[in-house]
């Protein structure tokens, strides 16, 4: 028996396929999902979601949202998502560098908050890119 996993953003579906296991970056910590998991609704933070399908792990950078688990279906609704193998690592590193620079130089509260969010997003993208497609 498998899980049906969907990762959906406001403008596209990033993943829609069966899987054996899912690890979610819930706001309360990493959350592992296997078949026949109890029904669950959880908040998703900025981080890396991992999906094991066909015996191989795939990484997806996700940015804030919710996940619902019910009847062997995992539905993840997030603001942004990018599969690890599709991440432009150089662009993510540039975003991280820029965010770090703003944090080191700006005293504007709004700029610093945005820079912290950009930093989290960049780190998730880089981590997903490095995980790529592992067995």
Swiss-Prot record:
Keyword Cell membrane in record: no
Membrane topology: Peripheral membrane protein
The organism's place on the tree of life at top rank: Bacteria
One Gene Ontology cellular component: plasma membrane-derived thylakoid membrane
Compartment(s): Cellular thylakoid membrane
Primary site of residence: membrane
GO molecular function: ATP binding; proton-transporting ATP synthase activity, rotational mechanism
Keywords: ATP synthesis, CF(1), Hydrogen ion transport, Ion transport, Membrane, Thylakoid, Transport
Role this protein plays: Produces ATP from ADP in the presence of a proton gradient across the membrane.
Subunit structure: F-type ATPases have 2 components, CF(1) - the catalytic core - and CF(0) - the membrane proton channel. CF(1) has five subunits: alpha(3), beta(3), gamma(1), delta(1), epsilon(1). CF(0) has three main subunits: a, b and c.
Family: Belongs to the ATPase epsilon chain family.
Protein's name according to its UniProt entry: ATP synthase epsilon chain
Organism whose genome encodes this protein: Synechococcus sp. (strain JA-3-3Ab) (Cyanobacteria bacterium Yellowstone A-Prime)
Gene of this entry: atpC
